[in-house]
């Protein structure tokens, strides 16, 4: 893993002014970024969201998933606290890529759930890798976090990278009639920590 920090810039948003920090991975040719707000230094745990790219949810406002709602909720939560970071990883479709995600959606249209669709295409249920986070966390000076997540794999990944998780903050939002089956599959087959009747 060859992660290199590139540059930072201001990013005005509907939730206030963030700093955007660019990183490149020479092994995968992917570009990742961190959105940060406030001073991340010190011993106090930093409010953090690990968010994998979802073009359909983040940019096209798809209701098939909860990704866009989760991203916006994380930005809002950080703006209220005045301090935090979102690690935005270019791992579209739980790591299978955009076109394969469309293929998976096609299978879901025919009745497969999100896990069955991935497996029918020859992929694992979740192909994401989080190893790039270690140098990104080091660059940002973050070693202790309050992690906004429902996904136990992210918790395990950060612990494995030596990140101290002071607290897990449930991050349920965006449930609607179009994604309720998807969310139940994430809870039942992927072990996500969901209540099942969140808003």
From Swiss-Prot:
According to the record, the residues making up region (Disordered) are 172-199
Instruction: Describe which pathway this protein belongs to, using the record's wording.
Output: Cofactor biosynthesis; riboflavin biosynthesis; 5-amino-6-(D-ribitylamino)uracil from GTP: step 1/4
Q: Which InterPro entries does the entry link to? A: GTP_cyclohydro_II (IPR032677), RibA (IPR000926), RibA-like_sf (IPR036144)
What CDD domains is this protein classified in? GTP_cyclohydro2
Binding locations of GTP = 49-53, 70, 92-94, 114, 149, 154
**Cofactor binding notes:** Binds 1 zinc ion per subunit.
Query: Which NCBIfam families did the record assign?
Result: PRK00393.1, ribA
Protein's UniProt name: GTP cyclohydrolase-2
- Please name the source species: Teredinibacter turnerae (strain ATCC 39867 / T7901)
| Encoding gene, per UniProt annotation | ribA
